[in-house]
Amino acid sequence: MSSPSIAPVTPDLVRLRATARDKDDAIAQAAQLLVAAGCVAPGYDASMRRREGLANTFLGHGLAIPHGVGEDRHLVRRDGIAVLQLPEGVEWNPGQTTRLVVGIAAQSDTHITLLRRLTRLIQDPAQLEALFTTDDPAVIVAALTGDRAPDTSAAPATDLAERFEWTIAYPSGLHARPATRWAETARGFSARAQVRAGDQAADAKSLVGLLQLGLRAGDSITVSAKGSDAPALLKRLRAVMDSLTAQEKADAERAAQRRAAPVIGWTPPQAQPAIVGIGASPGVAIGIVHRLRAAQTEVADQPIGLGDGGVLLHDALTRTRQQLAAIQDDTQRRLGASDAAIFKAQAELLNDTDLITRTCQLMVEGHGVAWSWHQAVEQIASGLAALGNPVLAGRAADLRDVGRRVLAQLDPAAAGAGLTDLPEQPCILLAGDLSPSDTANLDTDCVLGLATAQGGPTSHTAILSRTLGLPALVAAGGQLLDIEDGVTAIIDGSSGRLYINPSELDLDAARTHIAEQQAIREREAAQRALPAETTDGHHIDIGANVNLPEQVAMALTQGAEGVGLMRTEFLFLERGSTPTEDEQYQTYLAMARALDGRPLIVRALDIGGDKQVAHLELPHEENPFLGVRGARLLLRRPDLLEPQLRALYRAAKDGARLSIMFPMITSVPELISLREICARIRAELDAPELPIGIMIEVPAAAAQADVLARHADFFSIGTNDLTQYVLAIDRQNPELAAEADSLHPAVLRMIRSTIDGARKHDRWVGVCGGLAGDPFGASLLAGLGVQELSMTPNDIPAVKARLRGRALSALQQLAEQALQCETAEQVRALEAQREGQA
């Protein structure tokens, strides 16, 4: 491969002995040099400043590389580099002084070669100091455009005995996920293996080494090997490299479609750079951003004997691998293989020979093991971040994260920050992901909104965000975590966008929108006790999804007419042991008494798939969503099912008005078996008969609704799981989550099929999934024939208001239109059409 050419830098684009008042002035001067040379159009400096809000362009060691955002590439007329020498320096960020500003204008990513060269310059302090003070612009030009960095001791890489040529066909280049597969494959053989790009080569078994090549789509590489099994290694590695291409292209296409999708709801009057994710909880909020990350800890250099240090490092690496394996296994159980792969890639970093070698070299020089490890991690991570590729910047974050895990084993004082380390000013919280318990514990006085790099819109974190009333977006990708703390942003949880550094005009528009929405919510809240009755007199029952007795009062205050879903798994999830029959009985009775005679539907334990409980000692499954969960688990674990049923029937005997609902029913025999167990326990306790219903969550149940209705007293549709199974999409997969849309016509047709089957036996149908809590979704469901809707309490006023403002005949017409649509986007467009006609 021939190395990509450096963007042109000539003496007229170098300004020596300049001074700047501040960072903005330095950026303006660099941009002016580019404008004068015809490289960019006027206004490019604004794009460079917007980039500063998205990422820190300070490389360290006195170097900064301001450049524009990708959306403004139309301002670049030709590639160019402008250099502003500032001998006296200027503060780039607090505590960071820049003495050489390298302004970049590039229509593509050809400047990665320049960034690689700059990282080498950083490793030569004497050469770098000369650039800060030279009076000759040719010296700077030579340093930036020479074939190699000043260090000439290293010879160009040569290939090994066996080889093949390959062109990178991954649209995002070689990032961590495919690089991990490459390294894993190569390590399965004894032969030495190498990947060469131009005059640079990396050990094919080293993840970090592969990433440091900075390979982009279209780059040509030579893969070579030497050893007894070299031919087999190369054959297998090439097969793996080829097999990843289709998935990488599909992922890139989905990401492009998401970015290009029209914005539904509020839009800023001025075009602003936005991080695009998936809307998870509606609402708009304005605030500074705060990135949740581990604390930056000073690591003390405490030298010890090399032998003792080696033992400490080995033990720390072993414990960290065990920790990551446990996290990976837990994530696989709860969220699926896609999210678990994150921790697999992190564990792969611990096998990197460059990282271990660099640590050992520092220890040999007499440094302490913790200090040496920290320095090695930072050196390599800084090199990855400096390549200017946002994908590789994300891998630098991964390396630092796993590095901190090892550091915590070596030095417990280096533990990271948590949710308690929030700024005094209310903020929009950014995180890789949050567990449901973390989300539930958020202080809504301190957190205005939530954005995560991972996750899906039907995840439990998203559901809890809606419960808390926090605007939230998920699946925004690694770029979210590159945003600097303290930057002002607008989060729109409806469209799934985070607008960075908005203008005053945009801020004013957002404030107006927030005030208007607040006024609407106040009107809805004032009428929340009114029934959900359409303008032509049709009544829809409204229930709340509630987990604990103490939550009932708030649900009733919001307008709930009962509890349409009590998730009993939360009695098992939030403790270290299985609740006893008596403990469950007390909870169910307390729930019923809090409802004071209003209906209560209790779902039997729904564990498995995305919900796992360590103390239940469930077996590991490769695909838990298609494994032993819901009713399948209950029938296999009478030690869990029967105490729960006894507790429920005891509560009913003592006056509780309740119904029992079984999850994940897939067949008639399952339902009959469960009914027989209920009948036996009821007879043993001499308890009253209770209505027994089932969840419709899988296509098999929807398709057999007419048959199941012979044996069930009612149906409740779980739209979150039904969507996942109908569309064959893991709802936690950030790459696919945008497509897991409950408004997909295929899902709506399954709901209609369920209703038609239930009507044959005069059974009522409810919905307790996320679609019920969306006013537009609730309108569709009512039009399809759903008789009861159960939702997060905070959603009740808006849903009731929407239903009261429509005629059933209009909702039925809307539902018929939706069933004829081809995509979820077409269904959503019906809402805009209806609102426009209203």
UniProtKB/Swiss-Prot annotation:
GO terms for biological process: N-acetylglucosamine transport; phosphoenolpyruvate-dependent sugar phosphotransferase system. Phosphoenolpyruvate binds at residues 567, 603, 720-721, 731. The keyword Magnesium applies. It is found in: Cytoplasm. Its main location: cytoplasm. The gene is fruB. This is Multiphosphoryl transfer protein. InterPro entries: HPr-like (IPR000032), HPr-like_sf (IPR035895), PEP-util_enz_mobile_dom (IPR008279), PEP-utilizing_PTS_enzyme (IPR050499), PEP_util_AS (IPR018274), PEP_util_C (IPR000121), PEP_util_CS (IPR023151), Phosphohistidine_dom_sf (IPR036637). Its cofactor is Mg(2+). It comes from the Bacteria. The modification Phosphohistidine is found at residues 67, 175, 460. Disulfide bonds: none annotated. GO terms for cellular component: cytoplasm. Mg(2+) binds at residues 697, 721. It comes from Xanthomonas campestris pv. campestris (strain ATCC 33913 / DSM 3586 / NCPPB 528 / LMG 568 / P 25).
